[in-house]
Amino acid sequence: MALTTEEKKQVLSEYGLHETDTGSPEAQVAMLTKRIVDLTEHLKMHKHDHHSRRGLLLLVGRRRRLLKYVQKVDIERYRSLIERLGLRR
């Protein structure tokens, strides 16, 4: 599911480094997390939507790679990010 402009602005204002930040790893991970949560809710209702399930797996993989990068570059930023997002890693 695509995010609306308002949802994107809300996520970026909370997790971005500045107001117009869309490229930092934190902002990207937060956007992916929002999309993953929305898609997970969709798949709970539409169990046979395998096309969306594959898209979900791709998003999870992309988020995992970005988190691995943040962990490698700055472990404190990584710990702060997963705590703020409520991820299990």
From Swiss-Prot:
Q: Which InterPro entries match?
A: Ribosomal_uS15 (IPR000589), Ribosomal_uS15_bac-type (IPR005290), uS15_NS1_RNA-bd_sf (IPR009068)
Q: Where is the composition biased (Basic and acidic residues)?
A: 1-21
**Molecular functions per Gene Ontology:** rRNA binding; structural constituent of ribosome
Q: Which SUPFAM superfamilies would you find in this protein's record?
A: S15/NS1 RNA-binding domain
Q: Where is this region: Disordered?
A: 1-24
Keywords associated with the record:
Ribonucleoprotein, Ribosomal protein, RNA-binding, rRNA-binding
| UniProt superkingdom | Bacteria
Q: Which GO terms describe its cellular component?
A: cytosolic small ribosomal subunit
Q: What is one process in the GO biological process aspect for this record?
A: translation
Family, similarity comment: Belongs to the universal ribosomal protein uS15 family.
Q: What does this protein do?
A: One of the primary rRNA binding proteins, it binds directly to 16S rRNA where it helps nucleate assembly of the platform of the 30S subunit by binding and bridging several RNA helices of the 16S rRNA. Forms an intersubunit bridge (bridge B4) with the 23S rRNA of the 50S subunit in the ribosome.
Q: How does it assemble?
A: Part of the 30S ribosomal subunit. Forms a bridge to the 50S subunit in the 70S ribosome, contacting the 23S rRNA.
Which PANTHER family does this one have? RIBOSOMAL PROTEIN S15, BACTERIAL AND ORGANELLAR, SMALL RIBOSOMAL SUBUNIT PROTEIN US15M
Q: What's the name of the protein?
A: Small ribosomal subunit protein uS15
Which gene is transcribed and translated to give this protein?
A: rpsO
